[in-house]
Amino acid sequence: MSGTRMAGKVALISGGASGIGAASAKRFVAEGAKVILGDMQADKGQALAKELGSNALFVSLDVREEDQWQAAVSAGQERFGPLTTLINCAGVSIPGTIEEIGLVQFRHTLAINLDGTFLGCKVGVEALKGGKGGAIVNIGSTLGNRGGSIFTAYSASKGAVKMLTKAVALHCAEAGYDIRVNCMHPGAIHTEMVEGYVAAGIAAGATREAVIEGFASVHPMKRLGKPEEAANAVLFLASDESGFTTGGDLTVDGGYLA
């Protein structure tokens, strides 16, 4: 699948080495974009950049560090020209109810999922407003809309990402910047994160099939989502096709929030 839906775009994708971030990078390049893969997983990031060829660049990025965000933007712009698109995809999930999860784990989750998205938006707006505008896509979650008792920290972080998206979108519109900011909310997508839960379930005595069925069963469509399906939604929000959409929420959840 290839085309020109992202022709002329330069996109920085945090968490770009795996999962939805990697799937989005592949779709973007297939549609004509140049991509900067920001991640702490150097081996995976470099391998993906090599696979994507001259249209991709890997940069080491800890989303909790503002100077690393600025360095990633600078490296990308030096290689490909002005940034037009930012995808805040880096994330972590540590399961636990309010009685089980500790403050250190809670703060770690928020530091990556919320602080990282905040810094991405902050640095991204500064980069995009000086050019011809562009698009920012944040990755939320169904659990940031509905909550999940065993995902206390993750739900809190993603609920905050949803509201952060709206605040940044309104600011950009009110300031006259041609920058759209939207949020994509995935359900259970079959990525490395879900595979981590599968491994934990197996270690606890469950079968692989039972764990996957457990995740799939919460969706009315009774299956896990594919990374490519989530990436297609990110592509739409990042492309000019969504030119009159800002501050919005797009769900890819098999009917979970219906």
Regions found by a protein language model. Give the residues of each.
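Alpha-helical segment proximal to the catalytic Tyr-Lys
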Residues: E126, L170-E174, G243
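C-terminal substrate-recognition "lid" of short-chain dehydrogenase/reductases
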Residues: F80, F118, R223-V252, L257
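Short, small/polar-rich loop/turn modules that mediate ligand/substrate recognition or access, typified
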Residues: A173-R180, T245-G247
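Residue(s) in the substrate-gating loop at a strand-loop-helix junction
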Residues: S141
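Canonical Rossmann dinucleotide-binding motif of NAD(H)/NADP(H)-dependent dehydrogenases/reductases
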Residues: R5-I36
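Substrate-binding pocket helix/loop in short-chain dehydrogenase/reductase
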Residues: T97-I98, G102-L110, F215
